Amino acid sequence: MALKFHVLHQSKKSRARVGRIETAHGIIDTPAFVPVATNGALKGVVDHSNIQLMFCNTYHLLVHPGTEAIAAMGGLHKFIHRNSPIITDSGGFQIFSLAYGSVAEEIKSCGKKKGSSSILEVTDEGVWFKSYRDGSKLFLSPEVSVQAQKDLGADIIIPLDELLPFHSDTTYFLSSCARTYVWEKRSLDYHKKDPRHQSMYGVIHGGIDPKQRKIGCAFVEDHPFDGFAIGGSLGRNLNEMVPIVDITTSYLSKDRPVHLLGIGDLPSIQATIGFGIDSFDSSYPTKAARHGLILSSQGPIKIANQAYTNDLSPIDPECTCLTCTSKISRAYLRHLFKVHEPNASIWASIHNLHYMQEFMKNIREQILHDRI
């Protein structure tokens, strides 16, 4: 079945809302944080049963083991033994970010083009690129991307789009926006021929140009997408991103869920939740964990700091995650990081992911009480 979206409460203080998305593989309470499982696995975490929605990257799974191989094994849910909802991207983001830099390098897309680009050619038909594994030449079109996502069998899928760096000139930027919407229409048409249980979100581009964002919103509104995803360049920092997300969401109808692509750090969530964003995806908590940055109710903890050398207190006294209930102390976790013990990032990742889920639960409570 295609997803069903219900708004359970609209805040009286802002455009924030509490909702519920129903999919063939389960319920997603919104607003939701969606962790990224690049290759079908959350880095440093084995158990993802408490994660309602997980984001997997089509590009990486297309390169290895291959989406057709996954389809032959019964689809991604069966392959990774997951019974809850999955969202996949088109593969376009990875192709372009490997050439220009990642979301985090700009907030979204102001990285300079890398000297040795993986992109070989972008045409109206699609994009030719080199595999990051063996350098082989691969082609991704709207139809190829959607078929790959159908092979994977994700609950929510994304049409192919072109991600440009912040510094792109105006002429190419406008032609890219136009090409992206043609690609999205082709993606949607291909999806509608065999929708199965899947839903497709339309991606809104336009960079930091309010006029182009309005055009993008009109495009996705005028087509039967099941939800909306805010994509493209969102500026060089949080101050530039916030007004763009604000104006973009103001153009959208309230009957479909809204996802903010590639953004999910705490400051960004806090700054944009009031605009009616229903889900955020990011590798932020697991990446932070691998670098020894621990999220806590008392603020971020840089566990390598010498201050924690003899600190036997729990990482977060208010936390109920496996790490904290196992009495892992700050001193012990610091020791594990200092000696490069793999368990260090595992304990930290378990904690950070749990913290994000509890953080979003608290946000939903605040919206229900009209505090946000």
Curated annotation (Swiss-Prot):
Belongs to the queuine tRNA-ribosyltransferase family. Substrate binds at D89, S90, G91, G92, F93, D161, G232. Zn(2+) binds at C319, C321, C324, H351. Binds 1 zinc ion per subunit. It comes from the Bacteria. It catalyses: 7-aminomethyl-7-carbaguanine + guanosine(34) in tRNA = 7-aminomethyl-7-carbaguanosine(34) in tRNA + guanine. Residues 262-268, 286-290 are annotated as: RNA binding. Its cofactor is Zn(2+). Homodimer. Within each dimer, one monomer is responsible for RNA recognition and catalysis, while the other monomer binds to the replacement base PreQ1. Pathway: tRNA modification; tRNA-queuosine biosynthesis. InterPro entries: TGT (IPR004803), TGT-like_sf (IPR036511), tRNA_ribo_trans-like (IPR002616). The lineage of its organism: Bacteria, Pseudomonadati, Chlamydiota, Chlamydiia, Chlamydiales. Keywords: Glycosyltransferase, Metal-binding, Queuosine biosynthesis, Transferase, tRNA processing, Zinc. Its EC number is 2.4.2.29. This is Queuine tRNA-ribosyltransferase. One of its GO terms (molecular function) is tRNA-guanosine(34) queuine transglycosylase activity. Catalyzes the base-exchange of a guanine (G) residue with the queuine precursor 7-aminomethyl-7-deazaguanine (PreQ1) at position 34 (anticodon wobble position) in tRNAs with GU(N) anticodons (tRNA-Asp, -Asn, -His and -Tyr). Catalysis occurs through a double-displacement mechanism. The nucleophile active site attacks the C1' of nucleotide 34 to detach the guanine base from the RNA, forming a covalent enzyme-RNA intermediate. The proton acceptor active site deprotonates the incoming PreQ1, allowing a nucleophilic attack on the C1' of the ribose to form the product. The active site is at D89, D281. GO terms for biological process: queuosine biosynthetic process; tRNA-guanine transglycosylation.
